[in-house]
Design a protein with these regions (language model features):
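Short low-complexity, flexible loop/linker segments enriched in glycine and/or proline
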Residues: 46-50, 67-71, 223-225, 322-329, ...
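Surface-exposed amphipathic alpha-helices with a cationic face
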Residues: 26, 42-49, 294-307, 348-350
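Conserved beta-strand termini and adjacent loop/short-helix elements that scaffold enzyme active sites
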Residues: 55, 311-313, 357
Length: 358
């Protein structure tokens, strides 16, 4: 099918635009028609003789399961706005300044074991007996006047970030989508069965585009519209964290990570900063986990006679195409959203049979 005028081109389509979709496919020489985030293809398109390419975000669009099992949702470490003490007692609401629709405090006993309170002026960790927590607020005792204090804490991420961006930017009104953590055994079992069912119910699909895998790049929204994006980092690992991940890491490496390994005096572990030895260990730990789980998904897709492509953006953290484990996953194609020649090269040099640029 490939020639100078046809092939190697994927055209987005949408139900309701059948005539336009098929006319453009013919005019531009498309060999594949795909859906997009929030769109569907009608039978008129899927039965028109083109390869069909369907988009799946494996960790979202499972809101009913997330409501029934909220403990399977993803998390992150956050830190409160530093508060200057003016007396011996100081009160901090950890989530003040964050977007309330994105985060909820994880104040379970398991999570509280990882909370920390810091005197940032003296750069010292307060002992647990120096503070208490109740009803969404932390109360510090024996403060030093005019020292600045902050709380590092675990929070549930209750709105998947790409869906959140599309809602707030494009004024979507559909239900907010949540995200599951495949590290939770219940979520992982559910996701595998969901993918098998999806493959059975969509025999017309030739290629499944995973958008992407499990953990999104860090994108933290604030409550102030003038400072909506508090922090974003395309390659940060902060959104992979959970008590389960921290425990598994400690069992394997023989030492424990703390909130401060991620918060880093409020500077966070941004990609442009040289990684610490702890961060290097944690990155390798996450990459192996992601590769192992992704390989299982690819095997499921292949078992139904379909190809598995992956989008090199969004929930891509841990699957680095130039990392040690990417080629072991077995993807049939890599897709990259391109803004420059540098990103073209990022996609083109990866070890995978098909390279697709958006």
């Amino acid at each position: 099918m490939n020639s100078y005028t046809k092939g190697g081109f994927t055209l987005p389509g949408e139900a309701g635009y059948e005539k336009l979709t098929l006319e453009m496919a013919e005019k531009w020489g498309a060999d594949v028609i795909r859906d997009s985030d929030g769109t569907k293809l009608s039978p008129e398109i899927t039965e028109a003789g083109y390869k069909i390419y369907s988009t799946i975000c494996i960790i979202r669009e499972h809101n009913e399961f997330a409501r029934q099992h909220p403990e399977t949702q993803q998390q992150t470490f956050l830190f409160s706005e530093p508060r200057t003490a003016t007396g011996e007692t100081t009160e901090i609401r950890p989530l003040d300044g964050y977007f309330a629709e994105q985060f909820a405090l994880n104040d379970s006993a398991e999570a509280m074991a990882y909370w920390q309170v810091w005197d940032r002026t003296a750069d010292c960790l307060l002992p647990p007996e120096a503070w208490t927590y109740a009803e969404g607020r932390v109360t510090l005792r024996h403060c030093i006047p005019y020292h600045r204090y902050s709380v590092s804490f675990l929070a549930w991420r209750i709105w998947e970030e790409i869906n959140m961006y599309n809602h707030t930017t494009n004024h979507w009104t559909s239900e907010h989508l949540r995200q599951l953590d495949p590290r939770h055994p219940l979520a992982w079992e559910y996701l595998q069965e969901w993918l098998k069912r999806w493959c059975r119910e969509n025999p017309q699909t030739n290629v499944i585009r995973l958008t992407s895998l499990f953990y999104n790049f860090v994108w933290i929204f604030g409550s102030d519209l003038r400072r909506r994006t508090r922090f974003t980092d395309w390659a940060s690992y902060d959104f992979t964290v959970s008590p389960a991940a921290l425990k598994a890491f400690e069992q394997e490496y023989g030492y424990a990570l703390t909130a401060e390994d991620f918060i880093n005096r409020g500077r966070l572990q941004a990609t442009h900063r040289p990684p610490t030895a702890h961060k290097r260990d944690y990155m390798d730990f996450i990459q192996r986990f992601v590769a192992d789980k992704a390989r299982t998904l690819v095997d499921i897709i292949h078992s139904f006679g379909k190809e598995a492509y992956v989008f090199y953006d969004d929930s891509w953290v841990g699957m680095e195409p130039y990392g040690k484990y990417f080629s072991s996953i077995g993807f049939d194609g890599l897709i990259k959203c391109v803004f420059s020649g540098f990103e073209c090269r990022l996609c083109a040099g990866a070890e995978v049979p098909v390279h697709e640029l958006l």
